[in-house]
Curated annotation (Swiss-Prot):
GO molecular function annotation: structural constituent of ribosome
Cell location: Mitochondrion
One GO term (biological process): translation
InterPro entries for this protein: Ribosomal_uS2 (IPR001865), Ribosomal_uS2_bac/mit/plastid (IPR005706), Ribosomal_uS2_CS (IPR018130), Ribosomal_uS2_flav_dom_sf (IPR023591)
GO cellular component: mitochondrion; small ribosomal subunit
Family to which this protein belongs: Belongs to the universal ribosomal protein uS2 family.
Keyword Mitochondrion applies: yes
HAMAP family in alphabetical order: Ribosomal_uS2_B
Annotated keywords: Mitochondrion, Ribonucleoprotein, Ribosomal protein
Protein name: Small ribosomal subunit protein uS2m
Amino acid sequence: MYNSNLLVIQKLLSTNAYLGHRIPTSDFQGYLYGFRNEMAIIDLEKTLICLRRTCNLIGSIISAKGHLLLVNTNPEYNKIIQQMAKKTNQSYINHKWIGGFLTNWKHMKKVKKHFQDFSAHPNLKDAFTSSPFDYFPRFKKMQKCFEGIMTHNIPDCLVIINANQNSMAILEANQLQIPIVALVDSNIPNRLHKLITYPVPVNDDSIKFVYLFCNLITKTVILSKRSQRPKVKVKRL
């Protein structure tokens, strides 16, 4: 077990997952290994523990036929998130969070249906030489919002790649007691950290780690689908 842990930590080291910011927030202190050249160093053993907890949670949700919503606002990670969602058949949002997306879910379902009816209109493509959404700003905004949503049901878990930029998503999920998995860097505000049920302490600016993390979640989802059982209500922590 020790050798296995060591190999994983070496892999994490290669992604620069341990590099924090100069001034970590007080709630993040428990995840620190120390400081080097005035930079916070994240304890990767604790990162590994959090990754295992995350995989256990996601595995149990998928096994119970639950659904994930992947949330990201960093354009650098867009393709990674899209590929992950496609491989796992989960939902994703790769743009700024729309207020009320979760807390006003019934309304959002109606808006989504309106968008789908509009985009599926048989004469729509023939009427425009370019994308019809270019002529309808409202529907172009809807396209960004709904293009990655694969379910009509409210998600069973949020997986957030950049927590600092998604405070509204965190607040809404917390209000509805939806479990939140989030990559948290050393500058995560205390008020947000308290709301995240499954934080993963890490350098969230590392594209190598984000790729590694998404690959891990993808494998967890695929393996868990093989042992799916009738859906049950997942206990909210």
